[in-house]
């Protein structure tokens, strides 16, 4: 039997998909996970990295990002984001539509070292006017809805397109209500893919959007502030939210610049309502705050009392299941060889939501390193996790 290419030695491995939480080694061969266990034996050519005292998880998946760098005003660099945030799979959510997806694929997705998958926007040019100087919702004009083109592009790019995206709300769709969502759902039905729906201020209402979503569809910005919050001012979860969860609608955080509230989150968690996935909605207008990155978004939930394994679950296996990509999100042997190395820094840390409310947390998740496709990709400190190779046996 051939030896391992890489072993991460002695970290606390947290893999919620396999109910693993303990000190283990993780081995990779041929770009895939090869084994998880104690004292895995290297061969002469195995690269060994000592991660004792650190946390090793499946490669983090950020279900809501904008990484069409250079092609849209809101796009950030996916590889830089991966290095800083420990994210090995970025899901771009509608930056590109059928009219410009070919450029996104050729110039960004195929050139990126980090993995990029995408929700295709039903609007022809995706999210094209989103900056500090100009803001125009792409769903405000139904003339820009391109259902036939979207079907054709989604069918031709099934290897990287995981679903259909639409944005509705006062800022994104003006007075169009749920009309853009209706078109997007028709596209999603036609290609047999899930849909992700953005929601902002009404119209339409939170309830009206939820009523249209199907099992497996994702409502992003799910813990947004008033108006269109999922709970009342008294902290009661709206009945439509509970009904949607029962039928299988997924609730994603999508922090961003305007879509995550501590007040809402406290109410939802107090009622035992966890999001299905935690994502950053990282883009040019929130990368310098209040979202910053995926690990900062995860840290907020950790500091609000969500146990670390549950936080990891929502950015690994839960995200993979939302994508219908079971080869991601777990360190199960045979899965894609991605892993993230994390640490927890104790102390006093300031966090802020989109309403300007500050919260002092007692810990912070730090991305220390990543493994991409079975190869060590990045360490926050160059000398940390320096590789070693065992001597060949005589």
Predicted regions and their residues:
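Metal-cofactor-binding active-site regions of metalloenzymes
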Residues: 85-91, 95-96, 111-141, 165-168
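His/Asp/Glu-enriched, well-ordered alpha-helical/loop segment
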Residues: 263-344
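Divalent metal-coordination and catalytic microenvironments
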Residues: 11, 26, 31, 53, ...
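Active-site core of metal-dependent hydrolases
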Residues: 166-288
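C-terminal cap of metal-dependent C-N hydrolases
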Residues: 11, 336-390
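Metal-associated gating/positioning segment near the N- to mid-region
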Residues: 50-111
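Short, acidic/polar
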Residues: 71-80, 143-154, 203-209
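Histidine-rich, glycine-flanked metal-binding segment
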Residues: 1-57
């Amino acid at each position: 039997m051939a030896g391992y290419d890489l072993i991460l030695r002695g970290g606390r491995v947290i893999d919620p998909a396999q109910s693993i939480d303990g000190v283990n080694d993780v081995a990779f061969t041929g770009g895939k996970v090869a084994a998880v266990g104690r004292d895995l034996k290297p061969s002469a050519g195995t690269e060994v990295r000592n991660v004792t005292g650190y946390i090793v998880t499946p490669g983090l998946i950020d279900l809501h990002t904008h990484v069409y760098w250079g092609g849209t005003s809101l796009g950030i660099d996916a590889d830089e984001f991966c290095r800083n945030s420990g994210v090995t799979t970025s899901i771009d959510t509608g930056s590109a539509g059928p009219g410009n997806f070919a450029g996104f694929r050729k110039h960004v997705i195929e050139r990126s070292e980090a993995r990029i998958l995408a929700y295709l926007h039903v609007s022809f040019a995706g999210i094209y006017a989103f900056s500090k100087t100009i803001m125009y919702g792409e769903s405000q004009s139904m003339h820009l809805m391109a259902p036939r083109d979207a079907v054709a592009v989604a069918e031709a790019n099934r290897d990287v397109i995981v679903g259909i995206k639409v944005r509705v709300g006062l800022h994104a769709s003006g007075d169009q209500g749920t009309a853009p969502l209706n078109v997007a759902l028709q596209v999603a039905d036609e290609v047999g893919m899930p849909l992700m729906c953005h929601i902002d201020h009404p119209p339409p209402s939170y309830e009206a959007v939820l009523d249209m979503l199907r099992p497996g569809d994702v409502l992003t910005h799910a813990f947004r502030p008033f108006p269109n919050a999922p709970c009342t001012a008294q902290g009661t979860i709206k009945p439509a939210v509970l009904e949607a969860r029962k039928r299988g609608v997924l609730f994603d955080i999508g922090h961003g610049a305007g879509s995550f509230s501590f007040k809402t989150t406290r109410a939802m968690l107090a009622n035992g309502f966890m999001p299905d996935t935690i994502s950053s909605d990282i883009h040019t207008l929130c990368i310098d705050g209040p979202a910053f990155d995926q690990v900062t978004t995860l840290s907020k939930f950790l500091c609000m009392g969500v146990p670390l394994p549950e936080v990891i679950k929502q950015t690994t296996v839960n995200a993979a299941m939302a994508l219908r990509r079971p080869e991601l999100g777990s360190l199960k042997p045979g899965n894609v060889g991605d892993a993230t190395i994390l640490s927890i820094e104790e102390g006093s840390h300031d966090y802020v939501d989109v309403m300007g409310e500050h919260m002092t947390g007692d810990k912070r998740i730090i991305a220390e390193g990543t493994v991409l496709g079975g190869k060590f990709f990045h360490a926050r400190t160059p000398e940390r996790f320096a590789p070693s190779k065992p001597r060949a046996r005589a």
